[in-house]
């Protein structure tokens, strides 16, 4: 089990990367389990936790993905739905939000934003047989390209 920020998580990550030198990615599920408990300003605490993990990632030249939950309340901006303060989204290099309107449903929207990436949104459908999210629409691609892909798939099928 992972330690929390300020209580051993840095050493755990460093030791793991030392024992597995080809490590490029660490996934922490969930961020809440390793957060510091603080009576400080909530924004400052959130930003400090993210900055701490970012400094470890930069030092070890790895990516750290934090799994975190969304608020139940709706908002036009998916980043505003991330639970906690904007210190979480503001401190990270990139943010990804998977929004599933219905837990049991197969449809979702995936939003990406960050310092070094273009903003992007995708409509997805979860294939329960293959266990893979299929891209239905992608803001990064022009509709013509998607239409060509769909047409090519239909022609190939026929």
Could you say what each language-model-derived stretch is?
Residues 41-42, 71, 148, 152:
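Alpha-helix initiation/capping motif
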């Amino acid at each position: 089990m992972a330690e929390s920020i300020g209580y051993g998580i840095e050493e755990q990550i460093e030791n793991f990367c030392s024992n597995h030198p080809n490590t490029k990615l660490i996934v922490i599920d969930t961020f809440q389990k390793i957060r510091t408990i603080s009576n400080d300003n909530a924004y400052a605490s959130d930003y400090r936790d993210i900055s701490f993990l970012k400094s470890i990632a930069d030092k070890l030249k790895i990516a750290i993905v934090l799994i975190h939950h969304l608020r139940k309340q709706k908002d036009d901006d998916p980043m505003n739905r991330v639970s906690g303060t904007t210190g979480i989204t503001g401190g990270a290099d990139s943010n990804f939000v998977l929004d599933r309107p219905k837990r049991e449903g197969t449809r979702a929207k995936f939003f990406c934003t960050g310092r070094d990436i273009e903003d992007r949104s995708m409509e997805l459908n979860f294939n329960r047989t293959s266990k893979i999210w299929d891209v239905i629409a992608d803001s990064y691609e022009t509709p013509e390209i998607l239409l060509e892909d769909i047409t090519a798939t239909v022609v190939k099928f026929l």
